[in-house]
Amino acid sequence: MQTTFKTFAIFMSPLVLFSCGGGEQKKEETTESKPVVFTQPEFTYPQTWKDSSAVDTYFDLKVADPYRWLENDTATNVKKWVEEQNAVTFGYLDKIPFRQKIKDRLSDIYNYARASAPSKEGDYYFYTKNSGLQNQAVLYYKKGLKGQEKVFIDPNALNKEGTSTFGIVGVSKDHKYAAIGRNDAGSDWQLITVREIESNKETGDTLWWCKFTDAAWYNDGFFYSRYPTPAKGKEFSAKNEFHKVYYHKMGTPQSKDILIYEDTKNKLHYHNIGLTEDDKYLVLTKSSGTDGFETHYKPVDLKKGGFTCLFSGFTNKSSIVDHKDGKFYVYTDIDAPNYQLVAIDPTKPQKENWTKIIPESTHLLDGVNTAGGKFFASYLQDVSTHVYVYDYSGKQESEVKMPGIGTAGGFAGNPEDTETFYSFASFNYPTTIFRYDIKTGKSEVFFKPETKFNPDDFEVKQVWYTSKDGNKNPMFVVSKKGIKLDGKNPTLLYAYGGFNANITPSFSVNQIPLLENGGIYCVATLRGGGEYGEKWHQAGMLLNKQNVFDDFIAAAEYLIDKKYTSKEYLAISGRSNGGLLVGACMTQRPDLYKVCFPGVGVMDMMKFQKFTVGFGWVPEYGSSDNKDQYKFLYGYSPVHNVKDVEYPATMVTTADHDDRVVPAHSYKFIATLQEKQKGKAPCLIRIDVNAGHGAGKPTAKVIEEVADMWSFMFFNMNKDVMYK
């Protein structure tokens, strides 16, 4: 496929990314956090009006929705409610005595240079760098690896607040132009402009209301996908419908773009367009959500329609990796839950004519990239990356040796390339960029960051535990070396468990304040993810979703049973689908945790499909519109399962511009929780203003949010921090 890439935003999500990193640097003096008894600040929850008349009917089930009015996030009364909730939350946080110390430490350890792997486009190399505390990474380029480094786009200069991100979404085949995608305030909406690479000047081409698209260049323009212009005031909440594919010719207004594909019968389908590297075929992928997708193709032209279906239905996932010598090379899970690579002649696409290039293995084939006329196949073996090199006949030539257990990514390039680049990271291994010589099979360090703590102080273990139904699950445990298993360690348990997503070892400085203060950071591998293939995914989706919650609860019970921690010192966290995970587990087992952090979570399982792109999650969750699924969803929907009982200290996090998981989910959940909390622990919501779902959040905001979360956790565990 045509090589396209996006800048790697150095975004350290407060709960998603993981621990540790290296360098012989100044070390903060700490010991284990001291047990103390803090006095809870006095606070009063804002009054939240209940509309007793708001009731929805799902078949034979009537469901009260008293906080429905909070769904209108642009309404004056909702904005006032947001201000009142934030006033209570930040008033509480302001009274935590060590909050500033944690923020200062985070600012110190964030201040290190980091970079992405370079992407080669003709003679140019593009990459991002962040000098340390820059709000957004800067996109650089140079002509040749030893050429002069120049700034291509500096988001920090274009937006002083640091809330805009920029990335290359496609480079023209003559390497003269780059299409740039801009996202503001964390929104999924993308504004596409074009820059001439040599002069680094904008051409004036401007494309609005793009979402989930790259730019596939062809001749003097490119193919892309967009939505119709949304109604004013509904840009961040209205359901997105009729995703269409267009061709934009350089120098013409968007209104003159040529419609290439639309589906008037299926208004909720996504449509993405690509181009094979040899420019012979347009490849259209259609999806109804996050399950699988159809693949269609046609010889390249600018006519509407005319596509031939290669893979039909949305039950499988297949993507064309390359087209060479008249064959499509396809990465697919058809008849291979752990995926395989096959060669398909488009004139004889029937399955009996396929040629297996890389057969299915007992381990998950996590992806296949091409560079220098080779396939780079990435496998997951017990949630750790292993990469093997194959020729186009399927002969395995070598393995790319990794520094240890961790996660590798990259290995993209063009057929004529003699080198490729990749990144490697782990919990205690800072993200390092390697250059790989395709001819010799040798790797060398290209960029290694220097961080302000010693990774040798920490250790990583992978343990296995048993879930409720007997399923065996792995979990990573990160801590200082020699930590005592006495049940008194402040512990944060994180997981995701959904959408076939792989949660693999990664690197972040966010967890350092926990580890430096004698804490433990744990990442549980749950069903619903993709770490062990499609069967593992299916075991945690739709009517099997309870398995995910059971896996997470079992992980917590394991940590308590093995005395890593206890109920008094255990916090749980997750974001997005992981926010749903935390919401469900804290309503099912409120007795098991001391602190809960549901972040940007899907909390109303009866209505999620009615907002923005929520309809795309129906294949994963099911729908309240389905008579076979609505009662199951209602049975675990966090908003609908808050009882009049004692709940742990909870800080919900969301953002007012989140157009992926709209903030109404979190608003309604916290309103219900504040209403029904029978204990004394605080139930607060931290609402980020002028921010979105998380991607591209400015470094300054990340530091503030992470500091607030650690402060809230340590304070409610009665643990002091040992920073001077």
Which residues fall in each region the model found?
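Bacterial signal peptide processing site
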Residues: 21-24
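A flexible loop/linker signature enriched in serine peptidases of the S9 family
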Residues: 130-137, 159-163, 182-191, 206-211, ...
